[in-house]
Amino acid sequence: MARIAGVNIPNHQHAEIALTAIFGIGRTRAQKICDAAGVGRNVKMKDLSDSDMDRLRDEVGKFTVEGDLRREVTMNIKRLMDLGCYRGLRHRKGLPCRGQRTRTNARTRKGPRKAIAGKK
């Protein structure tokens, strides 16, 4: 298995798909990285030469990925919570912050239902 940006990349997948194993790289960015590095999108990772891998590493290194990106996202959410703005309050309460309804649904953010004694 090859390592790029501290992540083990699966050998049996095509380069375009395998790069999406890195946090912060989706299909579109993976396509652009492959094109910029001059690596075919449909070439399996195990078939790439060392020079191809080095070019991929260089291209991935130009983006904020993995730990740095996770840290940045966490800091952005923490900043919102410290400001006390509406989005920060919603994050603090564990509720959706993009305007979705919460009377019904929103179970993913709110967690499992809490039983209320005396109901029924």
Curated annotation (Swiss-Prot):
Annotated segments matching region Disordered: 96-120
UniProtKB keywords: Ribonucleoprotein, Ribosomal protein, RNA-binding, rRNA-binding, tRNA-binding
Keyword Oxidoreductase set for record: no
GO biological process: translation
Keyword Ribosomal protein included in the entry's annotation: yes
InterPro entries listed in its UniProt record: Rbsml_uS13_C (IPR027437), Ribosomal_uS13 (IPR001892), Ribosomal_uS13-like_H2TH (IPR010979), Ribosomal_uS13_bac-type (IPR019980), Ribosomal_uS13_CS (IPR018269)
Cellular component aspect of the GO annotation: cytosol; small ribosomal subunit
Top-rank taxon, per record: Bacteria
GO MF entries: rRNA binding; structural constituent of ribosome; tRNA binding
Quaternary organization: Part of the 30S ribosomal subunit. Forms a loose heterodimer with protein S19. Forms two bridges to the 50S subunit in the 70S ribosome.
The family this protein is said to belong to: Belongs to the universal ribosomal protein uS13 family.
Its job: Located at the top of the head of the 30S subunit, it contacts several helices of the 16S rRNA. In the 70S ribosome it contacts the 23S rRNA (bridge B1a) and protein L5 of the 50S subunit (bridge B1b), connecting the 2 subunits; these bridges are implicated in subunit movement. Contacts the tRNAs in the A and P-sites.
Protein name: Small ribosomal subunit protein uS13
